[in-house]
Amino acid sequence: MRDVKKRKIAHEAPEHGSDTESTSSHKSVAQQDDPLETQDEATATESRPAPKSFKDLGIIDQLCEACETMGYKAPTPIQAESIPLALQGRDLIGLAETGSGKTAAFALPILQALMENPQSFFGLILAPTRELAFQISKSFESLGSTINVRCAVIVGGMDMVSQSIALGKKPHIIVATPGRLLDHLENTKGFSLRTLKYLVMDEADRLLDMDFGPLLDKILKVLPRERRTFLFSATMSSKVESLQRASLSNPLRVSVSSNKYQTVSTLLQSYLFLPHKHKDIYLVYLLNEFVGQSTIIFTRTVHETQRISFLLRSLGFGAIPLHGQLSQSARLGALGKFRSRSRDILVATDVAARGLDIPSVDVVLNFDLPTDSKTYVHRVGRTARAGKSGVAISFVTQYDVEIWLRIEGALGKKLKEYELEKDEVMVLAERVGEAQRQAIMEMKNFDEKRGTKAKKFGKGKRSRDEMDQEEG
């Protein structure tokens, strides 16, 4: 029985209870639901000074210069704990929140190993969404710019032939969503990962939440056993434990999260208790309050995302939608416009809650409450990043009280109600009503186009391409 050894940093609360890994034979993720057994723990008992630079971690000068160029001044906690172990050739489980610097934590050791032993198909990174895959590839290319690292992004919604050509050029690093990667492994002549040295499963909890388990099983079966594997996740669910046991060899666990529902101190959180029928009016009022600030509005459905985008545009706001049913080019275009601030309002489903590189968000508005506390934390975590301040306001209607109380319970505190003059809000009622009628007209056209597309492609099981996009 191989043990998973835990490594903790000084500010992490000690855990009681433990878990283990199965024997070396490959088992499917679905077969790994056994009760967790006792394991040994390797804890950092001595107080060690925090590393001041990437060079202190063992990163070579060439890559340190790339870090400096990218603005990485000092290692984050997950980088400080993970990189030295990865450089020792250990399999790793990294538990850390979005925005903690996970990508560099696995990219730097892989690039350093690549420099020592250059070869094609050296590393494979699996990601749950297309946007995250492109983002990871960009990080690899930037960090590896001085060594001319070649990356290929293999995701659904893009042309298979052009991707086959890219694979034929034998890139060093492949960043992929599971569905499209498996398509190429099964159908692209001459493509194989038999020589792969590194496998990374990023946002592993989301990979499994999106039903990629069976696809991961098939991918793992064709990868060489003699490889290093890194698994990064925000949470350690039973499904992630199963994936860990199926894919990692004697791993060390690094955790920098002491409370999975913790939010940063620079985030000002509050709520608005309001009638459901007046949500649009309150939304417009708040956007006028925060005019000029970078804002993400979270909704629960694709329909609401589009409707609110139409509503706000008719009122003169620079709003742009982001959801899983947009084409890949439209999604990347929306993110590009929001990052460049040519549009300062992003209306999104939870496709934008985690994993996307949006460096500066001032305000998060939960127009629709999420159904669970974990998603709430990931949503509001889009703002107040890297030491900056941020605001998060949640709309709580008469139908949302129970959900909101659960969220507050998970946070361990009561949040303040956002103060405003309701009479001032309702002054906007007539103007917003006109915009609502305009949005209804535009939604009819939008729904007709969606219906035509659905009929064209027919119904049935979800394709791998559809699984490669977050539904929303």
UniProtKB/Swiss-Prot annotation:
<keyword id="KW-0539">Nucleus</keyword>
<dbReference type="GO" id="GO:0003723">
    <property type="term" value="F:RNA binding"/>
</dbReference>
<keyword id="KW-0378">Hydrolase</keyword>
<dbReference type="GO" id="GO:0016887">
    <property type="term" value="F:ATP hydrolysis activity"/>
</dbReference>
<feature type="compositionally biased region" description="Basic and acidic residues">
    <location>
        <begin position="10"/>
        <end position="19"/>
    </location>
</feature>
<dbReference type="GO" id="GO:0005634">
    <property type="term" value="C:nucleus"/>
</dbReference>
<feature type="short sequence motif" description="Q motif">
    <location>
        <begin position="52"/>
        <end position="80"/>
    </location>
</feature>
<comment type="function">
    <text>ATP-dependent rRNA helicase required for pre-ribosomal RNA processing. Involved in the maturation of the 35S-pre-rRNA and to its cleavage to mature 18S rRNA.</text>
</comment>
<dbReference type="InterPro" id="IPR014001">
    <property type="entry name" value="Helicase_ATP-bd"/>
</dbReference>
<dbReference type="InterPro" id="IPR000629">
    <property type="entry name" value="RNA-helicase_DEAD-box_CS"/>
</dbReference>
<dbReference type="Pfam" id="PF00271">
    <property type="entry name" value="Helicase_C"/>
</dbReference>
<feature type="short sequence motif" description="DEAD box">
    <location>
        <begin position="202"/>
        <end position="205"/>
    </location>
</feature>
<dbReference type="InterPro" id="IPR001650">
    <property type="entry name" value="Helicase_C-like"/>
</dbReference>
<feature type="domain" description="Helicase C-terminal">
    <location>
        <begin position="282"/>
        <end position="426"/>
    </location>
</feature>
<dbReference type="GO" id="GO:0003724">
    <property type="term" value="F:RNA helicase activity"/>
</dbReference>
<comment type="similarity">
    <text>Belongs to the DEAD box helicase family. DDX47/RRP3 subfamily.</text>
</comment>
<feature type="compositionally biased region" description="Basic residues">
    <location>
        <begin position="452"/>
        <end position="462"/>
    </location>
</feature>
<feature type="binding site">
    <location>
        <begin position="96"/>
        <end position="103"/>
    </location>
    <ligand>
        <name>ATP</name>
    </ligand>
</feature>
<comment type="subunit">
    <text>Interacts with the SSU processome.</text>
</comment>
<protein>
    <recommendedName>
        <fullName>ATP-dependent rRNA helicase rrp3</fullName>
        <ecNumber>3.6.4.13</ecNumber>
    </recommendedName>
</protein>
<dbReference type="InterPro" id="IPR027417">
    <property type="entry name" value="P-loop_NTPase"/>
</dbReference>
<feature type="domain" description="Helicase ATP-binding">
    <location>
        <begin position="83"/>
        <end position="254"/>
    </location>
</feature>
<keyword id="KW-0067">ATP-binding</keyword>
<dbReference type="InterPro" id="IPR050079">
    <property type="entry name" value="DEAD_box_RNA_helicase"/>
</dbReference>
<keyword id="KW-0347">Helicase</keyword>
<dbReference type="InterPro" id="IPR011545">
    <property type="entry name" value="DEAD/DEAH_box_helicase_dom"/>
</dbReference>
<keyword id="KW-0694">RNA-binding</keyword>
<keyword id="KW-0690">Ribosome biogenesis</keyword>
<keyword id="KW-0698">rRNA processing</keyword>
<dbReference type="InterPro" id="IPR044765">
    <property type="entry name" value="DDX47/Rrp3_DEADc"/>
</dbReference>
<dbReference type="InterPro" id="IPR014014">
    <property type="entry name" value="RNA_helicase_DEAD_Q_motif"/>
</dbReference>
<dbReference type="Pfam" id="PF00270">
    <property type="entry name" value="DEAD"/>
</dbReference>
<dbReference type="GO" id="GO:0005524">
    <property type="term" value="F:ATP binding"/>
</dbReference>
<feature type="region of interest" description="Disordered">
    <location>
        <begin position="1"/>
        <end position="52"/>
    </location>
</feature>
<keyword id="KW-0547">Nucleotide-binding</keyword>
<feature type="region of interest" description="Disordered">
    <location>
        <begin position="444"/>
        <end position="472"/>
    </location>
</feature>
<dbReference type="GO" id="GO:0006364">
    <property type="term" value="P:rRNA processing"/>
</dbReference>
<feature type="compositionally biased region" description="Polar residues">
    <location>
        <begin position="20"/>
        <end position="31"/>
    </location>
</feature>
